Swiss-Prot record:
Classification via Pfam families: Histidinol_dh
Entry function: Catalyzes the sequential NAD-dependent oxidations of L-histidinol to L-histidinaldehyde and then to L-histidine.
Name listed for the protein in its UniProt record: Histidinol dehydrogenase
Annotated organism of origin: Neisseria meningitidis serogroup B (strain ATCC BAA-335 / MC58)
Listed pathway(s): Amino-acid biosynthesis; L-histidine biosynthesis; L-histidine from 5-phospho-alpha-D-ribose 1-diphosphate: step 9/9
Keyword Repeat: no
Range of residues in the leader sequence: none
Residue positions binding NAD(+): 130, 191, 214
Keyword line: Amino-acid biosynthesis, Histidine biosynthesis, Metal-binding, NAD, Oxidoreductase, Zinc
Binding of substrate, residues: 237, 259, 262, 328, 361, 415, 420
Amino acid sequence: MKKLNTQSPDFQAGLKALLAFETAQNPETERIVADICADVQKRGDAALIEYTNKFDQTNAKSIDDLILTQADLNAAFERIPNDVQTALQTAARRVESYHQRQKMESWSYTDEDGTLLGQQITPLDRVGIYVPGGKAAYPSSVIMNAMPAHVAGVKEIIMVVPTPKGERNDIVLAAAYVAGVTKVFTVGGAQAVAALAYGTETIPQVDKITGPGNAFVAAAKRRVFGVVGIDMVAGPSEILVIADGTTPADWVAMDLFSQAEHDEIAQAILIGTSQAYLDEVEAAMDRLIETMPRRDIIEASLGNRGAMILAKDLDEACEIANYISPEHLELSVENPQEWAKKIRHAGAIFMGRYTGESLGDYCAGPNHVLPTSRTARFSSPLGTYDFQKRSSLIQVSEQGAQKLGETASVLAHGESLTAHARAAEFRMK
């Protein structure tokens, strides 16, 4: 891991270098994805079946072979162990409860002229959820993407999940059952994104696509954005821990590992105010790494993009955190709620030593789909509001038409838009 000290004259340069991440798009990936999207848009189900058989090594004869029914999802739920059933239900219940509180409601008011103004909230009609498949499957992603849509009132929640060599993951399908997914198609990759965006003979066009995927899925989401909405194009996972030295070093070490184990380019950073404590955490990491099944990935991640930063105090640590704008921020300090008030930019803020980031990944309640790569400066976690739309309401009274008409007429003539002005003037006495 890199070692930085805020008192060093080259600290800012070192911090910028630490956060620099090459996000340039791969031209070959973009070309392949463009071809796949165009083909699916043109040939529909036939192209989808062809690509699925090719990339997932399946033997689908028709689109019916790629459809799972509610009975299939229920059967998958019944096959998994009781403790896993309970865990999925507990996580879904907590995520639902949290996202209910995010739900936007319609409102209106009437001004002094009797004109009604307001905002009408409506859910999206249909959304698509992309879920990675195979052995590296993430049932938590199903719950985090589908449940907010369900809470928002979306009528159709369509999930696409690849099944390499026909391998279905019962826990993923059980999560779909618990989270209220209405349809499942066993397709993946850019071809699945294209099918959701453009529609095929069997898969209906959706209004928005959410969910994680590989580079091809990310490229496809970028390509179809504008035809449909997307959640975000997420970068590598990130965690930043601010520690005052009161949390056991082993806990902090494992929290850093929890994000580093995702990917060789994931980022784990620790900011402390004591060199002795940073040394203690480093020693804990050296000891605990021996127990990690994904040791190679963790070591590569920490070597590539990990860091320990020595700050002069917690105020400075919080300012650094605001600059970094991390996906996950742990405030492993005393009085964490007070320090949280100093944080302006973070996807999720985990307050206190008992609030491990992994609890948020699975079952705390808030969404784990979070902005990465410093985009928390201007964007937010996935939520119920992402599956709702706002329409402005305007009902002008007869009296209001006189005053508003006069104003509109003057402004319209100023823009040389005569019909605009006349339309307002016709309603004036």
